[in-house]
């Protein structure tokens, strides 16, 4: 049986652990410096953009399509195994288009997706107003509706993945930062430099391993530097507000995720909504510098103002939660790094 150690238990590490736990050939151990899902996972809205993405071929599209298909079975699979409900929205994504010059590109994507077996609908402004009366369509040239895309709570998904992995025999060690590795000689074809990792050390234990998976987000660079195979990962800022309204926006039976000017409006049920966006930092920005650059009030007010511009009704809501957090993004290569 092959021993695999996964370093990092956000949504990515937890998903890898769960999927590997389905294979009896592997014995899986997960290590995290904190609790599950406390890093970048807590700074994500979980909007799954596959069909509506302009990626139409190559690795990026294959991964998006495979994920889209897997989630259809994964969510009920986890809920049945763990008894935990996972908040998710299967009513699609509606992306507002404010520039008519972008429409030929959307029509081209629509044709490609149709050939691939997926639906994309291009709505005229009056259709948007009819289906989503809470949206301000004054500046809207059209909207693209993707009924097969979805949204899922990253935190709830992570907890369910952890519970499912544990039920399948995965060992989990939390609050244990990795402090070092043992490396051993290997056949040249086994590793880039002819050496492999044979053990992982924390402050309290050493764990032998046949392979490691690093899913440590912004902790990736220092870990890979220790292994003499550095992978540059830089920060982007995820930020959001949770807003409560006395009644649901628009039609209660049609609550898609809405995207306008790269600001997401995510329905959570019972009159609750996330409003969130991602802020890009300059490529040379270090995580420490990025953390110091988080003027939450100023940046969050800009996000809220952007959302109010296309959905005025949320200005009447009560802000019940605010957060900002850093998410990893590879530098100098395409995401994800596999």
Give the location of each predicted region.
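Beta1/beta-strand and adjacent pyrophosphate-binding region of the FAD-binding site
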Residues: 1-12, 29
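A generic structural motif
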Residues: 24-29, 171
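Dinucleotide-binding Rossmann-like beta1-alpha1 core, especially the glycine-rich loop
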Residues: 46-131
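Helix-loop-beta segment of a Rossmann-like dinucleotide-binding subdomain
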Residues: 84-96, 109-111, 116, 121-168, ...
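Helical element adjacent to the flavin cofactor pocket in flavoenzyme catalytic cores
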Residues: 143-189, 194-203, 207
């Amino acid at each position: 049986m092959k021993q695999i150690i996964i370093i990092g238990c956000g949504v990515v590490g937890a998903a890898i652990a769960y999927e590997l736990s389905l294979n009896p050939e592997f014995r899986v151990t997960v290590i995290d410096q904190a609790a599950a899902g406390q890093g970048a996972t807590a700074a994500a809205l979980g909007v799954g953009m596959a069909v509506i993405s302009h990626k139409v071929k190559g690795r990026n599209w294959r991964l998006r399509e495979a994920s889209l298909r897997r989630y259809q079975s994964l969510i009920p699979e986890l809920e049945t195994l763990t008894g935990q409900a996972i908040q998710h929205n299967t009513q699609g994504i509606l992306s507002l288009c404010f520039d008519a010059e972008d429409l030929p590109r959307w029509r081209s994507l629509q044709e490609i997706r149709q050939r691939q077996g997926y639906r994309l609908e291009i709505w005229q402004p009056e259709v948007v107003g009819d289906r989503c009366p809470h949206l301000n369509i004054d500046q809207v040239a059209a909207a693209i509706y993707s009924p097969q895309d979805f949204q899922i709570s990253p935190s709830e998904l992570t907890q369910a993945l952890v519970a499912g992995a544990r039920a399948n025999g995965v060992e989990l060690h939390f609050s244990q930062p990795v402090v070092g590795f043992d490396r051993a000689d290997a056949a040249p074809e086994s590793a880039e430099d002819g050496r492999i990792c044979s053990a992982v050390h924390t402050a309290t234990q050493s764990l032998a391993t046949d392979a490691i998976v690093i899913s440590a987000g912004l902790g990736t660079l220092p870990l890979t530097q220790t292994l003499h195979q550095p992978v540059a990962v830089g920060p982007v800022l995820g930020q959001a507000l949770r807003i409560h309204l006395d009644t649901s926006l628009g039609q209660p039976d049609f609550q898609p995720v809405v995207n306008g000017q790269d600001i997401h409006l995510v329905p959570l049920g019972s009159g609750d909504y996330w409003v969130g966006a991602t802020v890009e930092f300059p490529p040379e920005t270090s995580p420490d510098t990025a953390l110091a650059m988080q003027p939450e009030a100023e940046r969050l007010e800009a996000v809220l103002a952007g959302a109010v511009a296309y959905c005025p009704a949320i200005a009447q809501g009560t802000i019940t939660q605010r957060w900002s957090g850093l998410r990893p993004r590879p530098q100098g290569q395409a995401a994800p790094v596999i």
